[in-house]
Structures are given as structure tokens and as C-alpha cells.
């Protein structure tokens, strides 16, 4: 199934590049930013668990590290995106596609994060104990990785997403994007855990208490993501900054406004209602529903960041759908079969 989705994605990207290059470029960039961000955030989540000395996580640390198996593919996709974008950017208004030097810098950032992630994964695979030699190396690498992620993805957000609308400036935009990545990684982990809980072989790996812990984290990031979103809008209003309203007006009026409301409902409203009570965090079906809703909302979020600036106007059609399916298929294939150095949570059991 993943291979079929990848084939559809290639058809959509190549066909879209020939028929509607703006739409193909928009779809490729939005899906890249989301899935590369989730893959990196999975490793970051494992690093946070290691730095804090968490003992409740069970196999979640290994699951997060396995997300990192998509990072080499993401780097390759970025290289293709940079080359194709430079060709297709002729169809985009001048100044709305990053310059070559900016793309080189972004590629260097992705390469650095990939190197740190693989080194951290290797250190944990050699010895997960903090007091051993490899564990001490991981204690050094983990904080460096966290700092590099915060700075690196802030730059990537500024260059690849906010830079598409030069009239809009937000110093909070980078934090909003890298927190959104963590929100998506938690949703993907929660979805995986919920699916494991419904399988006889995986029920021991995802007991109700572990689902409850994941649900609480997902609920907290639901509130944080919404807070950061509102925090970027509020200063424009109370600071009376009319020159920055164009970015918001484009996304709050037809034809984009309906998608913005759907994004808020899927990213805040539905998860808030489902995860507010104890039952929603412990029942696999409810937790999985909230997780899928969050992932869909983040896909809409990245699309709304990119599409109004590059593709012009909706409706979204077969190009966007096929590229999204292809990207999801590539992510699933890498995570499911990728050569991660971390133990396989499905075969090594609970930590």
C-alpha cells in the first residue's frame, strides 16, 4: 500500500509540474515541511525523554527514534524540491521563493540535524544507560540536538514558510512551527500506540496508563499550539499593524477561510473535547480519533502557510491529494522498514 501511495505521489508531482507547477510546488513544500518536521520531532521527543530521565515511556522512545529513519529521505526530497523549485519558481511571483544561498543554508541545517540525530540514535543503541560510555556521549548529544532543533527549525520556518510572504514578519513563527512539529509527532506516536493497544501482540506495549500519559501530553500541546497561533494574531490587532494584515486577510477570507475554520476545529476543537476527560485518553478509539484529527489539522496548517502564496487559489484537487498520499506512503515505508539503530518496540518489548 505504501509503495502504491508513493507511485501516486510521483505521478502527481511530475504530472502537476507539467500541468500546474505552482500547485505541485505548493503541495511538495507543504508536505515536506510537515513530514520532515514530524520525523525530526520524533527524535527530539526521544531526546527529551532521555534528558529528563523519564521512566514511564516504555517503547515510546524507540518509536520516536524510528521516526528519524525518514530524515535521510527528507533530505533527498529537499534536494529535489530545491532543484525543481528553482525551475518552477519562474511561475511564482518574484521574491516568493528562497534564493539559492538560502536553500544551501537550509540544506546544511537539515544535514546537521540528520547527523546529530543519527549520532544520538547510535549512542542509545550501543548503551541506553546514562552512566556508560555511550550513555555519557548521549548525555552530551541530546542537549545539543535539542538546541540545534530549536534554532534550525526556526530558520527553516522563516526561510521556507514565512519567507513566501515577505510582507509578513513574526518573530514567533519559528517557535510556532517547531512546536507544531512536536504536536504532530505526539499525535503520530499516540496513533501508533492506540493501534498497538487494539492488537493482541501489542497490547502489553500500550497499556491504558501509557495511553493516558500520551493523551495528557497531546492535550497539553493542543492548548499550546492554539495559544501560539493566537499569539501571532493578537499583536497585529493591538499593535495596529495594517501592513501585516494582508497575510491574515488572505487566509481569513474566501476561498481560504473555510479551510482555516476546519483547521481550528480539527486542531483544537475536536481534540479538546475528546481528550478533556479521562476516558478519551485511555480508550484507543478516542485517542486515535483525536490523533488523526490533529495530523489532518497540521496538514491544513502547512497548506495554508504555503498555498495562498504559491498556488494562488483553491480548490485543491488530484495534485495535492496524490502528493499528500505519496509523502505519507514514503514516511510510513521508512518508519516501518527503515534501518533504525534503535531496538524495535514490537520485538524487544517494554523497557
Task: Name each model-derived stretch.
Residues 1-39, 43, 331-351:
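N-terminal regions that are enriched for targeting/export leaders
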Residues 1-16, 95-263, 280, 348:
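Long, contiguous internal "core" modules enriched in hydrophobic/ aromatic residues
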Residues 25, 32-129, 145:
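Transmembrane-helix bundle segments that line or gate the permeation/cavity pathway
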Residues 37-48, 75-81, 106-118, 179-194, ...:
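Hydrophobic cores of alpha-helical transmembrane segments in multi-pass inner/ER membrane proteins
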Residues 165-169, 241, 279-284, 305-319:
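Extracellular/periplasmic helix-loop-helix junctions in multi-pass membrane proteins
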Residues 173-177, 243-264, 307-338:
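Membrane-interface transmembrane-helix boundary segments in multi-pass integral membrane proteins
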Residues 227, 271, 302, 343:
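Hydrophobic, well-ordered secondary-structure elements that form the walls
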Residues 285-296:
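Central hydrophobic cores of alpha-helical transmembrane segments
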Amino acid at each position: 500500500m505504501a509503495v502504491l501511495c508513493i507511485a501516486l505521489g510521483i505521478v502527481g508531482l511530475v504530472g502537476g509540474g507539467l500541468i500546474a507547477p505552482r500547485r505541485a510546488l505548493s503541495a511538495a513544500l507543504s508536505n515536506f515541511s510537515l513530514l520532515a518536521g514530524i520525523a525530526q520531532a520524533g527524535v527530539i521527543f526521544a531526546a527529551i525523554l532521555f534528558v529528563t530521565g523519564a521512566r514511564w515511556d516504555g517503547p515510546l522512545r524507540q518509536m520516536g527514534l524510528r521516526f528519524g529513519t525518514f530524515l535521510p529521505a527528507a533530505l533527498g526530497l529537499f534536494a529535489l524540491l530545491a532543484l525543481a523549485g528553482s525551475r518552477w519558481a519562474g511561475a511564482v511571483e518574484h521574491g516568493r521563493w528562497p534564493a539559492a544561498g538560502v536553500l544551501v543554508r537550509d540544506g546544511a541545517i537539515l544535514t546537521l540535524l540528520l547527523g546529530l540525530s543519527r549520532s544520538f540514535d547510535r549512542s542509545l543503541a550501543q548503551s541506553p544507560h546514562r552512566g556508560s560510555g555511550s550513555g555519557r556521549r548521549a548525555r552530551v548529544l541530546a542537549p545539543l540536538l535539542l538546541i540545534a532543533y530549536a534554532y534550525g527549525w526556526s530558520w527553516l520556518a522563516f526561510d521556507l514558510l514565512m519567507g513566501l510572504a515577505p510582507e509578513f514578519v513574526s518573530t514567533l513563527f519559528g517557535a510556532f512551527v517547531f512546536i507544531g512539529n512536536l504536536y504532530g509527532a505526539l499525535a503520530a506516536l499516540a496513533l501508533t500506540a492506540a493501534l498497538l493497544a487494539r492488537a493482541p501482540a501489542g497490547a502489553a506495549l500500550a497499556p491504558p496508563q501509557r495511553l493516558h500519559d500520551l493523551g495528557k501530553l497531546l492535550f497539553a500541546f493542543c492548548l499550546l499550539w492554539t495559544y501560539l497561533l493566537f499569539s501571532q494574531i493578537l499583536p497585529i490587532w493591538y499593535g495596529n499593524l495594517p501592513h501585516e494584515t494582508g497575510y491574515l486577510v488572505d487566509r481569513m477570507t474566501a476561498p481560504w477561510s473555510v479551510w482555516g475554520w476546519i483547521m481550528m476545529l480539527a486542531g483544537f476543537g475536536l481534540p479538546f473535547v475528546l481528550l478533556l476527560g479521562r476516558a478519551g485518553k485511555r480508550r484507543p478509539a478516542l485517542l486515535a480519533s483525536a490523533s488523526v484529527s490533529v495530523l489532518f489539522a497540521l496538514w491544513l496548517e502547512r497548506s495554508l502557510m504555503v498555498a495562498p502564496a504559491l498556488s494562488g487559489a483553491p480548490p485543491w484537487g488530484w495534485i495535492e491529494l496524490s502528493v499528500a498520499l505519496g509523502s505519507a506512503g514514503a514516511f510510513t515505508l521508512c518508519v516501518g522498514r527503515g534501518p533504525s539503530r534503535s531496538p524495535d518496540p514490537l520485538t524487544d518489548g517494554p523497557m
